[in-house]
């Protein structure tokens, strides 16, 4: 993201003109959050680099200690995320017996979480949620369900906290993928799947595995993590978000699908319709990560109103 920095220029008029030109090329949202603006479309424009100076989702820059940690994360994830593991976790966490709290209380609780799988983010989680939501809100002002979906899409990361069992990072964050069928080569660090027990199981190591072509993603087990957990929380607590919102929540980390086009043989027509909204959402989810912070208290009343519209006051988690 672009951060305004005034450089010393002897002529103060030149300096003032430079700052004004920079501000004309940016969007300043309600919470004070600044995002780059496209001159062609007057809308959000994805930057080329993250705040660390690397390409977004750069998993090959092995010289960085941060990148090495991300690779080790995926090694562990690919080994341990099996079909049986996912079924076990869905059964346990589908009970929703860990806590009762509101959506906003969960947003605040999420500030205690660090996502070690993300090479682009080191700000508090609530900032990423609000940065994403505010950027979408500016470009899609009438789609309030999409604003709220952006706010809550990562709330399942509370699984990392002791109150929710303190699951290891590989069981909560990172890219997701179907289990019960072959691991597509589009998955990041695919080589580490060689340590996954399912790869040698004839039930699970074919293209369709335990599924049928066109069965629909609702019928597919995804690797366990914050996406699927928040999807279960929203559904079982009776959210009135449209199906596209639930689709975004469950599959926003499913990069092999929405970035590489893998696993499309499992989709049905409803999935294909919802995927269009996921593509919209992903641009903001990925590229709105910034060192420029949102004024939480300023935007809070708006998001509380959306929470009240689409969710009960208290949810079971």
UniProtKB/Swiss-Prot annotation:
* Null mutant phenotype: Incorporation of the inositol pathway-derived monosaccharides is strongly reduced in knockout AtMIOX2 seedling walls.
Residue ranges annotated as transmembrane are none
Q: Which reaction is catalysed here? A: myo-inositol + O2 = D-glucuronate + H2O + H(+)
Q: What is its EC number?
A: 1.13.99.1
> What superkingdom heads the lineage?
Eukaryota
Q: Which residues bind Fe cation 2?
A: 154, 226, 252
Q: Tissue range of expression? A: Expressed mainly in roots, stems, flowers and siliques. Low expression in leaves.
The subcellular location is: Cytoplasm
Identify the residues that bind substrate. Answer: 57, 115-117, 157, 174-175, 252-253
Q: Which SUPFAM superfamilies match?
A: HD-domain/PDEase-like (SSF109604)
The cofactor note reads: Binds 2 iron ions per subunit.
Q: Which residues bind Fe cation 1?
A: 128, 153-154, 285
InterPro entries per record: Inositol_oxygenase (IPR007828)
Q: What pathway is this protein said to act in by its record?
A: Polyol metabolism; myo-inositol degradation into D-glucuronate; D-glucuronate from myo-inositol: step 1/1
Q: What is its main location?
A: cytoplasm
Q: Per its Swiss-Prot or TrEMBL entry, what cofactor is needed? A: Fe cation
Q: Which GO terms describe its molecular function?
A: inositol oxygenase activity; iron ion binding
Got any disulfides in this one, which pairs? none
User: What does this gene product do?
Assistant: Involved in the biosynthesis of UDP-glucuronic acid (UDP-GlcA), providing nucleotide sugars for cell-wall polymers. May be also involved in plant ascorbate biosynthesis.
- Name the family: Belongs to the myo-inositol oxygenase family.
Q: What is this protein called?
A: Inositol oxygenase 2
**Source species of the chain:** Arabidopsis thaliana
Phylogenetic placement of the source organism:
Eukaryota, Viridiplantae, Streptophyta, Embryophyta, Tracheophyta
